[in-house]
UniProtKB/Swiss-Prot annotation:
InterPro entries: PsdUridine_synth_cat_dom_sf (IPR020103), PsdUridine_synth_TruA (IPR001406), PsdUridine_synth_TruA_a/b_dom (IPR020097), PsdUridine_synth_TruA_C (IPR020095), TruA/RsuA/RluB/E/F_N (IPR020094). It comes from the Archaea. Keywords: Isomerase, tRNA processing. The keyword Chaperone does not apply. It catalyses: uridine(38/39/40) in tRNA = pseudouridine(38/39/40) in tRNA. Gene3D superfamilies: Pseudouridine synthase I, catalytic domain, C-terminal subdomain, Pseudouridine synthase I, catalytic domain, N-terminal subdomain. It comes from Thermococcus gammatolerans (strain DSM 15229 / JCM 11827 / EJ3). Belongs to the tRNA pseudouridine synthase TruA family. Pfam families: PseudoU_synth_1. This is tRNA pseudouridine synthase A. The lineage of its organism: Archaea, Methanobacteriati, Methanobacteriota, Thermococci, Thermococcales.
Amino acid sequence: MKLALRIAYDGTAFYGFQRQPGIRTVEGELINVLTKLKIIESPEKNDFKGASRTDRGVSAFFNVVSFVPGERADLARPEVLNHNLHDLWVLGVAEVPDDFHPRFWAISKTYRYYLIDEGFELEKMVGCAKLFEGRHDFSAFARLEPGRDPVREITHISITPRHGYYVIEITGKSFLWEMVRRIVNALRFCGLSLLEPEEVGAMLSGVYEKKVPPAPPENLILWHIEYPNVEFKTDGKSLSKARRDLFERYSRALARAALFGDCLVEL
């Protein structure tokens, strides 16, 4: 039997997803709890795998890990795990086939970026966004890793205005390092007329002198991963701690925003 966990986390509390010695990461935190509870013996022995290695500061509402449970498989339940986790929540568990791999089985991944309105020209941003849809060489919009194919396909981009900010949603099967954050900054530059759509088209064709820098990571969240025939199960009781923790973060952020908003009004 193999299990998959749907996890969410506050990326600002971790130094990224991937395990690193001596620093707090999402993967490291989760493995520590799973081994402490004897659900797994070690990540190697129990085939621990993750879907997306989010960067430092990037949050997730839907990331996935899988493993073969050991001695205390009965404790691999959201309510038990959430009692032992901090800044990280298990939102569901699923039994999956033995050959399941959370990264390779993913049909698509969706990211959301929350961008404060700086007086953007929305039509220009939308026109620029359409250029990114489809299959392209994203070398100009990524931090390239040696030997990795820079060609990726984006199936959907949307820009939704809300009160004082925009939600940029980007969906594709896989992404390069910093790709989403660099695309967001390109859209931002287009909205401020610092970058023209024609320049974006040229960059996607391989014509560029410098790359677009990445937008800050703190406003990015891995929102959803689509899998074939995988159903994550949970219940209201299991989610109660996550709801409390998220509301606390929301309340704190809202109060700070109000505080600085009043300061701006008085200047």
